[in-house]
Amino acid sequence: MNIKHLLFFIGIGILTSCGNSDVIPVSKYYDYDHEIPLQETVKLITDTTDYKIYDVTYRSVHNKRVTALLTVPKNITEPFKVIILQHGKGDRKTVDYIEFGNEYFYKNGYAVLRLDASNHGDRIENEFDFDFRGKHKYWTRNIITQTVFDLRRAVDFIEKREELDQNNIGFFGISMGGISGAIFCGVDQRVKVPVLVLAGGQLNLMFGAKALTSDTNDYLSIIEPMNFIEQIAPRPLLMINGENDELVLPMMSKLLYKKAEKPKNIIWYPAKHHDMPLEEVYMEGTKWFDEYLK
């Protein structure tokens, strides 16, 4: 696809996605019954001089069981400000870059709740190909939508914990975690400060010649970050992206950022998708949380 065709698809695609979000209230898809019992379990598994880690499970929408870890710092006054930390596609709540972030955040005084995305980590049920265009495309889409529900139920869990500050919840999502996080933070106003890393919008650009069909736009409508990103305002949004990202193209990140309302900021690193400078990325996220979680 040459650049002229790509720009044409982008221009028409933006109009199409905007039109769909106006006509169809896609955010209503993520409504659910808050009063359904969480049936949560919380078990202490690590206790050190600096922090505690709890193994957590809870009941989500569609009767799914979510597996998570809650880290709480010691020697800090409760209730703790809390960060929901979400991994990317194919990974789990204990993958190295999430472990790094967990340690970085609790050392800066935050509690951290990290969960396995739908059909990831301890929650794997099927191992089909994750592909928006393949024969398992609806199964793939359901992973995103279910994770959004799971994240909303994570906030329900936080609200039940006396040691966690339900009025100071941040979100830090990476790659697929950032894409699902854009939807989650758009539909759930209880998240005070979102940070989206390696996320982008206009997902129909992945569909080539089929990018502009009504079937494609209908299929993507409930997982298209462009349909939700405006709802984050007036909460402060930080995006962090790679200038050489080969998976979430920089153009997709720029489109998502442009669609977002102020207050917002975006930080770029000269990096590909899998070689972002982790410490700098988490440092910038922590600075954002320090400024706005008050």
Model region roles, listed by residue range:
Residues E243-V248, D275:
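Acidic catalytic loop of the alpha/beta-hydrolase fold
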Residues I232, L238-N241, D245:
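Short beta-strand/loop motif that positions the catalytic acidic residue
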Residues F149-S214:
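Primarily recognizes the serine-hydrolase "nucleophile elbow" in alpha/beta-hydrolase
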Residues L249-Y257:
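Short alpha-helix in the alpha/beta-hydrolase fold that links the catalytic acid
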Residues Y269-M276:
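Histidine-bearing beta->alpha loop at or near hydrolase active sites
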Residues P277-W288:
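Post-His helix in hydrolase/transferase enzymes
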Residues G90-F149, M206-A209:
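Cap/lid segment of the alpha/beta-hydrolase catalytic domain
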Residues H34-T77:
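N-terminal cap/lid segment of alpha/beta-hydrolase-fold proteins
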